[in-house]
Amino acid sequence: MSATQKNNITRLEQLDRQSTQPFPNSRKVYLTGSRPDIRVPVREISLADTPTAFGGEKNPPVFVYDTSGPYTDPEVRIDLRKGLPDVRSRWIDERGDTEILPGLTSEFGQARLADASLDALRFAHVRTPRRAKPGANVSQMHYAKKGIITPEMEYIAIRENMKLQEARAAGLLDQQHPGHSFGANTPKEITPEFVREEVARGRAIIPANINHTELEPMIIGRNFLVKINGNIGNSALGSSIEEEVEKLTWGIRWGADTVMDLSTGKHIHETREWILRNSPVPIGTVPIYQALEKVNGVAEDLTWEIFRDTLIEQAEQGVDYFTIHAGVLLRYVPLTAKRVTGIVSRGGSIMAKWCLAHHQENFLYTHFEEICEIMKAYDVSFSLGDGLRPGSVADANDAAQFGELETLGELTKIAWKHDVQVMIEGPGHVPMQLIKENMDKQLECCDEAPFYTLGPLTTDIAPGYDHITSGIGAAMIGWFGCAMLCYVTPKEHLGLPNKDDVKTGIITYKIAAHAADLAKGHPGAQIRDNALSKARFEFRWEDQFNLGLDPDTARAFHDETLPKDSAKVAHFCSMCGPKFCSMKITQEVRDYAKENGLSDESKAIEAGFQEQAARFKDEGSVIYRQV
């Protein structure tokens, strides 16, 4: 074994230990479906009893959506060198419409496998890929249109509900504000049949490549919980395979529903294999990045044949969705000439350069139906890229952006003709007053295919804080109907994000997505808010920490000023102190009402006022007294 291999193995053993820590006072539980191999993970957060002073009652556990996969299950032994346990192979085999290939069929994949110099980097357990049988279509959309409810669809229905009926029965939803959904139509309970209908209609997608069998199925659509994506990937300037796998496991721990591998540096193929074999969430890529590496970064040298081989290479590895910039047409490129920031999408600029160099139409557009044939053979979903998205608020909603969007709508209908799943990528940089126009136009042009946006960033003045400038726009567009939000980290526009940046970006976007779910009135969205608010009022500090999106940070902030264990049961915090805590005062009012037989707080307050007025008169009505 080489020194490099030994070093890699040591790093991955350390990563194993980092990635398997359960959240405090939480445990992984599995909800079983109609068959024993449908085991849907959720995180159960146990809560303390309400103190006797506040009425003394049991508080039921709260179940939350869990993207962390087996990593937070202490019953599962994680070995990143072997990959995650299989989830879906039996379901795929039962359908009888796929075949195991004799080996990798892409030229590039075969060449990498034959290169002995890569042995130290390679994932040791490379799986033999499968593909649809000749003439077959294995997409979830194809099954949905045929009226088939797949195990993946049942799994998703259970996952989206998260024991909602039990929560209602326990009173966790006695308070939930009605939402304003802008035309979305989420039922009170998500059923497998509803999942099937939404996928068949094209309003939702299930990104689930038949070669990514470690995947825990999830859904992206405006009538479901708003999802978030986290980006990882190396560059020519740095990062290793180990660092990218670490970012993956860290990102899904904090709530990334999907992850995009945007690697542009060395060993893209090998890095992606490690990521896929250790990912319980869908993995997306931008294939044109790797295709460009194959021609040494010269966009003009790209060909359809190289791109096609790249699609097959990545599909056989198990990539679940491809960003493909097929809407960057030759006639749209001049429309960007007067922009402040021109073309800011890497994929968009690559294709624009190719179109201008050859004075030909984008080969991704002219070969689109051939791409569909590849996609449906592996069930890879389209993420139709917005290569002409605005890179500044000055360029928002211009002719180039909306021209491309109209073309993406045309391509969506072509993909649906092939029963290939589609979502649409969106901007970008958009001031708040223009965000709804983006959502409305996308729904109109793309016939309600799921929208997936990068933010949008609502202002350009805050480098280093673009997770905030974009989180504002993300919450808004999520409310208006966007199905998935691509996170932005504090390093946006500045550098490659590290592990801490990944966490910050994800937490910011979990807040935005949840705020959107609340605003839409998604059933069950308010359960966690209600539970945390009750814990806050009852001074159950540990429950407050544990119900939050980031228990570690909440606990650390509290402990900065009140580190002693006694502070965890105190009826105040360091913000107001013991004498000015509004919640403590409110409880005292309630106690006064109870002691004096008063039916509500307003009567208690009025009685208190009258009592103090009488005392003032009894003491001589003197404003100032000697003390």
From Swiss-Prot:
Keyword Translocase: no
Gene3D superfamilies: 6.10.250.620, Radical SAM ThiC family, central domain
GO BP annotation list: thiamine biosynthetic process; thiamine diphosphate biosynthetic process
Listed pathway(s): Cofactor biosynthesis; thiamine diphosphate biosynthesis
GO CC annotation: cytosol
EC number: 4.1.99.17
GO molecular function list: 4 iron, 4 sulfur cluster binding; carbon-carbon lyase activity; zinc ion binding
Cofactor entry: [4Fe-4S] cluster
UniProt remark on cofactor binding: Binds 1 [4Fe-4S] cluster per subunit. The cluster is coordinated with 3 cysteines and an exchangeable S-adenosyl-L-methionine.
A Pfam family this chain is assigned to: ThiC-associated
Keywords, alphabetical: 4Fe-4S, Iron, Iron-sulfur, Lyase, Metal-binding, S-adenosyl-L-methionine, Thiamine biosynthesis, Zinc
Binding site for [4Fe-4S] cluster: C573, C576, C581
Annotated positions binding substrate: N231, M260, Y289, H325, S345, R346, G347, D386, G387, L388, R389, E425, Y452
Keyword Iron-sulfur among record annotations: yes
InterPro entries with a match to the protein in the record: ThiC, ThiC-associated_dom, ThiC/Bza_core_dom, ThiC/BzaA/B
Binding positions for Zn(2+) per the UniProt entry: H429, H493
Polar residues: compositionally biased ranges: 1-24
Family: Belongs to the ThiC family.
Job of this protein: Catalyzes the synthesis of the hydroxymethylpyrimidine phosphate (HMP-P) moiety of thiamine from aminoimidazole ribotide (AIR) in a radical S-adenosyl-L-methionine (SAM)-dependent reaction.
Subunit structure: Homodimer.
Name used for this protein in its record: Phosphomethylpyrimidine synthase
Species per Swiss-Prot/TrEMBL record: Pseudomonas aeruginosa (strain UCBPP-PA14)
